């Protein structure tokens, strides 16, 4: 018989920097999960990633106080800002363009995000990422 699920917890935690302080501690503590066990497992799983890169994680909490977690790819906005060398996007993306990205850069981001996107192929994924870039005030070259 499968374990009874008591809930899901969605968090964004910097890679390799999970610790018991908020938001991790209170979110796991409410469900009675072992906070340090999660922190050690998450930090070990994100060891090969760029330190500090926010990683979305979905934690499944079970009735016997055990848990599993699934890591997603970093948010597209973070990857776009990193590729363009920006701290933040435009406050008015229609009139104030803050950077420029090429199709090659968008393809690289789309390949990174592919497991989490519902796009049918790489071209559709690139168009999805290009839309996110435009909404942040970035000019996109080579994508219609």
From Swiss-Prot:
GO molecular function, one term: structural constituent of ribosome
Keywords, ordered alphabetically: Methylation, Ribonucleoprotein, Ribosomal protein, RNA-binding, rRNA-binding
Pfam families, alphabetized: Ribosomal_L11, Ribosomal_L11_N
Listed Gene3D superfamilies: Ribosomal protein L11, C-terminal domain (1.10.10.250), Ribosomal protein L11/L12, N-terminal domain (3.30.1550.10)
Example of a GO cellular component annotation carried by this entry: cytosolic large ribosomal subunit
InterPro entries attached to this UniProt entry: Ribosomal_uL11, Ribosomal_uL11_bac-typ, Ribosomal_uL11_C, Ribosomal_uL11_C_sf, Ribosomal_uL11_CS, Ribosomal_uL11_N, Ribosomal_uL11_N_sf
Highest taxon of the lineage: Bacteria
Cited PROSITE patterns: RIBOSOMAL_L11 (PS00359)
Any one GO biological process: translation
PTM annotation: One or more lysine residues are methylated.
Family: Belongs to the universal ribosomal protein uL11 family.
Function: Forms part of the ribosomal stalk which helps the ribosome interact with GTP-bound translation factors.
Subunit description: Part of the ribosomal stalk of the 50S ribosomal subunit. Interacts with L10 and the large rRNA to form the base of the stalk. L10 forms an elongated spine to which L12 dimers bind in a sequential fashion forming a multimeric L10(L12)X complex.
Family matches, as NCBIfam families: L11_bact
The name this protein goes by in its record: Large ribosomal subunit protein uL11
Organism, scientific name: Neisseria gonorrhoeae (strain ATCC 700825 / FA 1090)
Gene name of the encoded protein: rplK
């Amino acid at each position: 018989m499968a374990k009874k699920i008591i809930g899901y917890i969605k968090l964004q935690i910097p890679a390799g920097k999970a610790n018991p302080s908020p938001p991790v501690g209170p979110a796991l503590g409410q469900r009675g999960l072992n906070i340090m066990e999660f922190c050690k497992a998450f930090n070990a799983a994100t060891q090969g990633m760029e330190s500090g890169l926010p990683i979305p994680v979905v934690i499944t909490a079970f009735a016997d106080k055990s848990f599993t977690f699934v890591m997603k790819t970093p948010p597209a906005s973070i990857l776009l800002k990193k590729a363009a060398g920006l701290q933040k996007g435009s406050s008015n993306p229609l009139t104030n363009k803050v950077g420029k990205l090429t199709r090659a850069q968008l393809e690289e981001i789309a390949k990174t995000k592919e497991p989490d996107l519902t796009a049918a192929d790489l071209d559709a994924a690139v168009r999805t990422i290009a839309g996110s870039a435009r909404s942040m005030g970035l000019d996109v070259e080579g994508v219609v």
